[in-house]
Amino acid sequence: MIYEERLTLTHSKSAEEYLEYCQTDRLEQLRAAGGEPICLLSGLIGDPANQYLQITAYEDVQAWEQAQAKLLPAPADLVESETARLMRPIASRPKPVVPQADRRAVYGCRRFFINPADLSDFVDSSENGIWPRIESQGACILGLWTTVATTQPMEILLLTGYHSPTHWEETRVTSRQQEGVDQDLRQ
């Protein structure tokens, strides 16, 4: 699988209209072109509310290229700027199909910049260290990706789902909510 990360900044007064366009037209266009939308997220804390992050899965690069020929660009009167790039999964997430039970109301989007030589340690620490602890608290890892191109430093994208901003806070190591977490998972 290959994934497209699309960052769209709408005109400040067009955010709601862009979201409606995605829900009524764009997501269906993606599916008809062979893509599988994984998520469409907007800024809540940190990123502006009129910035959208969309992750779409494709069978391979050829399927992505074929889809580009079929897709129409977003309406110019809604979009101020847009970038897209290909990402590859580097861990056990994303799952081939993300079940509804794994969907969350709020997602944390984190970007890490690491030395490519440290990738296997980074993935191991994520999958066997951090993820079991926060998943035991109800969080759900949507995916861990890096760019298709090899770069120095290597950029890593992590999307983690939470039930609410309060739930996110409860999963922090410094939170008082940590008292009920299996101490073996905190090691």
Regions inferred by a protein language model and the residue ranges of each:
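Short acidic, gly/pro-rich beta-turn/loop elements at beta-sheet edges
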Residues: E16-Y18, W64-Q66, P94, S120-F122, ...
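Short acidic/polar capping segments at secondary-structure boundaries
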Residues: P89-S92, F113, A117
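A generic short-segment signal for beta-strand/edge and adjacent turn/coil regions
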Residues: L7-T8, E20-R26, P75-E82, R111, ...
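Hydrophobic, helix-prone linear segments
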Residues: M1-E4, S14
